[in-house]
């Protein structure tokens, strides 16, 4: 089964999969508004050998068959502050270990 994949211009990393190109009748109005104007990316064969990167082909197919679309949300980004704290902690641990060796 071919599906059409669109990316959102409003939200980086958000993609909408529908059964046919330019067919959005099954997509709720609230989702259409939140998604913004869809930007066509490509047609994709869900039953082919290629795998989607961030979704399971069978899961996408099931959602399209049951509700007419599949919405892929952007990956969760770690807080930059949390990432900074983890890096600082790693540096401190490394420095303490280096001091003990001397």
Curated annotation (Swiss-Prot):
Protein name as it appears in the record: YcgL domain-containing protein MS1047
Domain annotation YcgL: ranges: 1-85
Domain of life of the organism encoding this protein: Bacteria
Pfam families (UniProt xref): YcgL
Provenance organism: Mannheimia succiniciproducens (strain KCTC 0769BP / MBEL55E)
HAMAP family: UPF0745 (MF_01866)
UniProt cross-references to PANTHER family, sorted A to Z: PROTEIN YCGL (PTHR38109:SF1)
């Amino acid at each position: 089964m071919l599906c059409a994949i669109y990316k959102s211009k409003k939200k980086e990393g958000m993609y909408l999969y529908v059964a046919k190109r330019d067919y959005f009748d099954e997509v709720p109005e609230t989702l259409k508004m939140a998604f913004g104007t869809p930007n066509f990316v490509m047609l994709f064969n869900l039953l082919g050998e290629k795998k989607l990167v961030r979704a399971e082909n069978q899961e996408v197919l099931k959602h399209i068959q049951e509700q007419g679309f599949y919405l892929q949300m952007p990956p969760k980004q770690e807080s930059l502050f949390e990432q900074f704290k983890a890096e600082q902690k790693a540096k401190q641990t490394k420095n303490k270990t280096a001091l003990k060796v001397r």
